[in-house]
Amino acid sequence: MKTKILALSAISAACLMMMSTAMAEDAPAVVADPGPVTANVTLASEYRYRGIAQTNSKPAIQGGFDYAHESGFYVGNWNSSISWVSDTYQGANPVVSAPIEMDFYAGFKKEVTEGVTLDGGVLQYYYPTSNLPTTAGNPNTTEVYAAGTYSFATLKYSYSLSDLFGQLGSKGSSYVDLALNYDTGVEGIVLNAHVGYQKVAGSANPNSSYTDWKLGLTKDLGHGMNVAVAYIGTNADGTVAFYQSPTGQNLGRGTGLISFTKAF
């Protein structure tokens, strides 16, 4: 689950993803030497996606690969350690195992005029699981997305073609977000700001929709490396099972995060 939260790179030189990404979906990618194939690896204090904790306040390791053709076509894979699926069904017998998220995406991104770039594609979130209860929703999710970037601002819209991350009856959910990544011109520091709204469809999910936000800084360390810090929060209803930890804490509560990324 990307976005692209804590800015963690699932984005290549030609692919802005959400995916967001710990501080994922709206941070600038760390880009190594330009080329058709790039890779990235990230260590994060926590993985948050659309403001919701995916690792229950624990660190995450993440990484991915991207191929970008000069025509604008791109395809890629991004992966992260997670705990939210097994946490959601804690107490189930036998124990649910779902330690990893695997994202597969493809799309087309092109500068249509000076300073204006359009991007569109499809994203599959895949969660290899075992012992998932038969009554549980399938966490695997398919979304299509469209985005436009002007200068340092990106507006993106995502629409789910399946139920959203296991919430039954939520097909047709949508997420819209605005990300600002402003180069301060000071010592390789970029100011990151983000606000998004997750609309969860279906009458069975009346309290699942919420707003999330982020404010942070990314520092270019050179040699394809960066460090990012951010404060992330949401107004998600902590009584909703998908937003509640096994100990009853709100998984969307405000928190500070830090991540280190290396691009190849």
Regions found by a protein language model. Give the residues of each.
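Cleavable N-terminal export/targeting peptides
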Residues: 1-36
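Short glycine/proline- and aromatic-enriched beta-strand/turn motifs that initiate or cap beta-hairpins
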Residues: 25-84, 89, 255
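Repeated loop/turn-to-beta-strand initiation elements of outer-membrane beta-barrel proteins
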Residues: 37, 71-75, 114-118, 152-157, ...
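Transmembrane beta-strands of outer-membrane beta-barrel pores
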Residues: 43-49, 69, 79-83, 124-128, ...
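Residues that define the transmembrane beta-barrel architecture of outer-membrane proteins
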Residues: 57-61, 98-102, 138-144, 149-151, ...
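Outer-membrane beta-barrel architecture
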Residues: 64-66, 105-108, 121, 145-147, ...
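Surface-exposed loop and membrane-interface regions of Gram-negative outer-membrane beta-barrel proteins
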Residues: 73-138
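Outer-membrane beta-barrel "beta-signal"
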Residues: 215, 219, 248-264
